[in-house]
A protein has these predicted regions:
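A glycine- and small-aliphatic-rich helix-loop capping segment at beta-alpha/alpha-beta transitions
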Residues: 59, 126-135, 151-158
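Generic N-terminal amphipathic, Lys/Arg-enriched alpha-helix
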Residues: 1-20
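Solvent-exposed alpha-helices and their adjacent loops that cap or buttress functional pockets
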Residues: 70-73, 102-104, 129, 152-156, ...
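N-terminal glycine-rich anion-binding loops that anchor highly charged ligand groups
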Residues: 2-5, 22-48, 62-73
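Phosphate/diphosphate-binding glycine-rich loops and adjacent basic-rich segments that engage nucleotide
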Residues: 145-181
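Active-site cofactor/substrate anionic-group-binding motifs, chiefly glycine-
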Residues: 46-99
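A glycine-rich phosphate/pyrophosphate-binding beta-strand-loop-alpha-helix module
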Residues: 92, 96, 100-138
């Protein structure tokens, strides 16, 4: 089995993303997402997903230079517009904001729309737990698998993630989805 060093993955992912219009910082952050997912053995949301993201960038389906913006704020609840930006960067920004709101109000909820695939949803549960917050994250998807006993794609994977900080360096974490990733 071919082994690629984590640092080499980040460097190459970043190089390709910068060549497709990402800023240096956003390319580094996005490359880290791909490499960490691969490092954790979630290749479907790491190295195996990368060619598809490059294809989407080349087709203009992902806009590499946009930043999600808050469209509506109601105290502890906000709705954000992703502007077809890169899903993991938008989702990280949304979770950062949800944690800020939670620390201010005791709860923080951010809905993010018009974004791209957020990759491994569990990343944002960990992000919340590492910030000392309980993270509950979910997403809807396009139909990508058949219902039990069927052949045609009728249901989405629709992941649900929960993460709770237990102590300074430990969290209770559950990443559920309808198929094996």
């Amino acid at each position: 089995m071919l082994r690629i060093k984590y640092e080499d993955m980040v460097k190459e992912f970043k190089r390709v993303l910068v060549s497709r219009g990402f800023t240096e910082k956003n390319a580094e952050d996005a490359a880290t997402v791909f490499a960490l997912n691969s490092l954790d053995g979630i290749y479907s949301h790491g190295i195996n997903r990368f060619p598809r993201v490059v294809e989407y960038l080349d087709k203009g389906e992902i806009n590499p230079d946009v930043v999600a913006t808050c469209e509506m704020s109601m105290g502890a609840i906000e709705r954000w517009e992703g502007h077809r930006g890169f899903g993991p960067l938008n989702a990280k920004q949304a979770m950062d904001r949800a944690c800020e709101l939670a620390k201010q109000y005791g709860i923080g909820m951010v809905a993010l729309g018009n974004s791209n695939h957020w990759m491994r949803g569990g990343s944002y549960g960990w992000q919340a737990a590492n910030a000392g917050c309980i993270g509950i994250c979910w997403s809807n998807t396009m139909p990508n698998m058949p219902a039990w006993g069927g052949k045609d794609r009728k249901i989405g994977n629709n992941p649900l993630i929960m993460a709770v900080p237990k102590s300074k360096n430990s969290s209770c974490y559950n990443d559920n989805h309808m198929n094996r990733v």
